């Protein structure tokens, strides 16, 4: 048989000697052989878990090798020789001393472990030895706190195997385990693999701590480099595990202060804390703490009993993969009003089951509008949270309303990934997730909620004087959760809501997927089914969705100048900008809208420097002052107020309320280049010929008929006073009723002819009026008798008013005496041979059946 590897058993000998010390009061005083004793040692070591299976297998190979190769006698002779020479006893003592480096059992120092005997002295002696302390199977009762000095290791035979508890006689005020220098602290403490039973039952079912951190199961003060692994804390009068600063009383020194002697570099893992008096695991005024893979559940009392509480002044704390169940708060990050809040806290993976408020972040005393703003409540980041069936069936905190998440008074809270699920919708009827009480700069992303069909709001940013603000909500999926999916209260100025998908077909009386009181949230990507309204903003319903953006907006633009928070640049290049409120540039290059309510579109190298100004489809143009428009023009400038430049080049428009057009110059705007103008008083000016676009060539005016009836086209008319009738033989002809007048005067198209006061010659009476702030113009003076409420019809719409062609080529009715080249006279309004005008053309010969023909006559 090949010789096994023996070097791996070098330390085994030391462990054997410890067992010899326990089993053999003196060497070889038992009847068993040496090999039997060695195998007994292996059996014992295997029972207490000191050897792994592969080590035992190797030892069996050693035994087989010794026996099969006939070395048994040699080994016995050698050991007996050592004993006779006194070497064996020395070896035993030496190995025992070395073995103690691996730990000493409290039973070695007299601990009984029957749950009745006071074992405190055994614990104190074992700890005082300076060696690692081992707690074997048993229930070890103590009559006072177990105090832990620096550089202490205490391990047990495992949770629920090794149990430490208080005797019933211990009064209120002691913690079961506490570091011995709780004023200024200890260091290098390692605790693992046992149960702490606070035996709170000795005080009755409603027992609570006597004050400060007293009466906790494990209390660590002002210490550093502390490892707490696989500890179960049950029946705590106060906290299961309490990490705090120096002193038994918590310090209340005011917000913005730092308590002296913090605990730091604390590592808590794989612990369990049921039947709490207050919190399962709590931290206070300490830093650099990790808590992982812990389970805190089922508190005894109905106060603010939290699974894990990161409390007053704690900072730089990391929680990972923990569980809470049936507590008031699953994880509470908080502070009282006169201390700093916990800050810079990371929660990465937590499952809250049946807690009232799965995640509760708050700084008490800083919630109302009149409270001082928190100086310290900042920085909480959460990833991959779960909330299962939040409820308050037990009536915690006077029946406080359940929440999945509540954020109050904290600045800088980020939640990335939160799954909330309930099969009991009636347990949460208000708001599931709330951002409230002056919380600011909160980001909620990756939220999935299912089953909260009776909740008024799935997510609610509460408004009013103490509401939240500066909140980003994105990537939200709601499955029958919330009559309102995302609701935003009043007075909240900075909210962004994006990518919300909701199904509400299982909700009684759903309202809207997104509902906001104010009109200025940013909203995009909202969709769903089962809700009557997709978005409701400031009371206005949008049933097909809505996209709202606040702040400077730039889209499809390669580069830009400054953009105002209420401006935009779209589809533009070459440093276009919108530098004023309510300004914009669209599809343009190198253009800047510099004034409020100004727009540049489809243009290049243009500038608006006045409000209410617009430039469209133009090049190298500028507007100043107020209300000007330039369209399809180049190298032009509109100043003054309410002026328009159309289809022009090199035009400078000034004054007020004018429409201008023209062309000229070499790119420098000038009024001399104006070719057409129309003023606010209706004055039209043209620099060149005004022509008609048809062949009509007479000039006409409106005249009222004597009998108030219309006179048919082509009849010659004469005056009777200021009115007209058909001209008779020998009467002076003033013209003919015309349908071909190129110019027509006197229609009074838009207003009653007496609307404005006139002088004795019929001219308008003017007065100076301030038409815009600081802008004065002469305007016709209103007639006091004018009533604008009366309906008005222009003369062209009234039958008594007829257009009379006075001058030009006019079509008239003729009899059979009229000849081309001769003049005419009138007979019952029909032209007959005479000496007025000249007949140019007979266009329709006379027909006796009709009683007239038609001729074109030139009248002067």
From Swiss-Prot:
Query: Where in or outside the cell is it found?
Result: Virion
Active site per database record: 701
Source domain of life is: Viruses
Q: Does the keyword S-adenosyl-L-methionine apply?
A: no
Report if keyword ATP-binding is assigned: yes
Task of the protein: Structural component of the 12 appendages that hang from the lower collar. Adhesion protein that binds to the host cell surface during virus attachment and mediates teichoic acids degradation.
- What is the official name of this protein in its record? Pre-neck appendage protein
Q: Which organism is it from?
A: Bacillus phage B103 (Bacteriophage B103)
């Amino acid at each position: 048989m090949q010789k096994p590897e023996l070097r791996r058993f070098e330390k085994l000998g030391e462990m054997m000697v410890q067992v010899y010390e326990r089993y053999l009061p003196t060497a070889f005083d038992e009847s068993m052989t040496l090999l039997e004793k060695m195998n007994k040692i292996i059996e014992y070591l295997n029972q207490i878990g000191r050897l792994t299976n592969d080590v035992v297998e190797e030892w069996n190979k050693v035994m087989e090798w010794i026996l099969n190769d006939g070395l048994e006698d040699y080994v016995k002779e050698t050991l007996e020789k050592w004993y006779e020479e006194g070497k064996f006893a020395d070896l035993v003592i030496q190995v025992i001393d070395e073995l103690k480096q691996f730990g000493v059992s409290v039973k070695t120092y007299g601990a009984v472990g029957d749950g009745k005997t006071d074992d405190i002295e055994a614990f104190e002696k074992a700890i005082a030895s300076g060696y690692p302390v081992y707690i074997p199977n048993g229930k070890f009762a103590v009559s006072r706190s177990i105090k832990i000095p620096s550089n202490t290791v205490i391990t047990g035979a495992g949770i629920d195997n090794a149990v430490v508890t208080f005797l019933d006689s211990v009064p209120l005020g002691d913690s079961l385990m506490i570091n011995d220098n709780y004023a200024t602290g200890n260091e290098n403490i390692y605790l693992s693999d046992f149960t702490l039973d606070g035996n709170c039952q000795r005080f009755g079912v409603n027992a609570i701590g006597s004050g400060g951190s007293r009466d906790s199961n494990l209390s660590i003060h002002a210490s550093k480099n502390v490892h707490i692994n696989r500890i179960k804390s049950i029946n705590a009068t106060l906290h299961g595990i309490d990490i705090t600063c120096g002193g038994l009383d918590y310090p209340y020194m005011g917000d913005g202060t730092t308590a002296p002697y913090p605990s730091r570099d604390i590592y808590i893992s794989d612990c369990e804390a049921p039947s709490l008096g207050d919190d399962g695991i709590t931290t206070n005024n300490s830093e650099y703490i990790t808590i992982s893979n812990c389970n805190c559940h089922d508190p005894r009392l109905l106060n603010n009993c939290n699974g894990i509480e990161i409390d007053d002044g704690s900072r730089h704390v990391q929680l990972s993969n923990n569980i809470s169940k049936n507590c008031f708060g699953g994880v509470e990050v908080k502070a009282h009003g006169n201390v700093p809040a916990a800050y810079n806290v990371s929660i990465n993976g937590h499952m809250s089951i049946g807690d009232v408020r799965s995640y509760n972040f708050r700084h008490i005393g800083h919630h109302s509008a009149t409270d001082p703003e928190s100086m310290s409540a900042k920085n909480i980041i959460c990833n991959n949270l779960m909330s299962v069936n939040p409820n308050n069936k037990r009536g915690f905190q006077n029946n406080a309303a359940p929440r999945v998440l509540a954020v109050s008074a904290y600045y800088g809270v980020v939640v990335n990934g939160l799954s909330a699920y309930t099969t009991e919708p009636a347990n949460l009827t208000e708001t599931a997730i709330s951002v409230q009480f002056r919380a600011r700069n909160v980001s909620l992303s990756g939220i999935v909620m299912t089953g909260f069909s009776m909740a008024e709001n799935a997510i609610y940013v509460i408004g009013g004087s103490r509401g939240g603000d500066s909140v980003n909500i994105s990537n939200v999926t709601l499955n029958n959760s919330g009559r309102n999916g995302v609701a935003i209260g009043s007075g909240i100025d900075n909210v962004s809501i994006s990518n919300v998908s909701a199904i509400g077909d299982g909700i009684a009386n759903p309202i809207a997927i997104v509902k906001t009181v104010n009109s200025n949230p940013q909203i995009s990507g909202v969709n769903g089914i089962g809700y009557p309204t997709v978005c409701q903003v400031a009371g206005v319903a949008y049933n097909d969705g809505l996209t709202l953006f606040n702040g400077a907006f730039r889209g499809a633009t390669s580069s830009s100048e400054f953009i105002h928070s209420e401006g935009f640049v779209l589809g533009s290049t070459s440093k276009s900008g919108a530098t004023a409120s309510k300004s914009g540039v669209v599809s343009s290059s190198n253009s800047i809208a510099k004034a409020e309510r100004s727009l540049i579109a489809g243009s290049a190298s243009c500038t608006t420097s006045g409000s209410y100004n617009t430039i469209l489809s133009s090049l190298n143009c500028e507007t100043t002052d107020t209300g000007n428009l330039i369209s399809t023009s180049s190298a032009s400038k509109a100043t003054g107020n309410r002026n328009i430049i159309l289809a022009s080049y090199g035009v400078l428009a000034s004054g007020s309320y004018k429409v201008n057009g023209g062309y000229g110059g070499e790119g420098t705007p000038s009024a001399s280049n104006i070719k057409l103008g129309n003023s606010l008083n209706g004055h039209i000016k043209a620099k060149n010929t005004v022509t008609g676009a048809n062949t009509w060539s007479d000039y006409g005016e409106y005249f009222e008929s004597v009998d108030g009836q219309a006179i048919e086209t082509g009849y010659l008319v004469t005056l009777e006073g200021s009115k007209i009738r058909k001209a008779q033989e020998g009467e002076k002809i003033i013209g003919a009723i015309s349908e071909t007048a190129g110019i027509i005067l006197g229609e009074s198209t838009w207003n009653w002819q007496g609307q404005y006061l006139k002088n004795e010659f019929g001219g308008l009476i003017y007065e100076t009026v301030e038409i815009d702030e600081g802008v004065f113009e002469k305007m016709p003076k209103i007639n006091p008798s004018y009533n604008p409420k009366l309906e008005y019809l222009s003369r062209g719409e009234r039958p008594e008013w007829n257009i009379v062609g006075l001058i030009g080529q006019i079509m008239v009715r003729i009899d059979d005496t009229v000849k081309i080249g001769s003049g005419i006279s009138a007979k019952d309004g029909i032209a007959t041979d005479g000496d007025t005008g000249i007949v140019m053309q007979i266009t329709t010969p006379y027909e006796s059946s009709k009683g007239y023909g038609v001729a074109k006559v030139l009248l002067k």
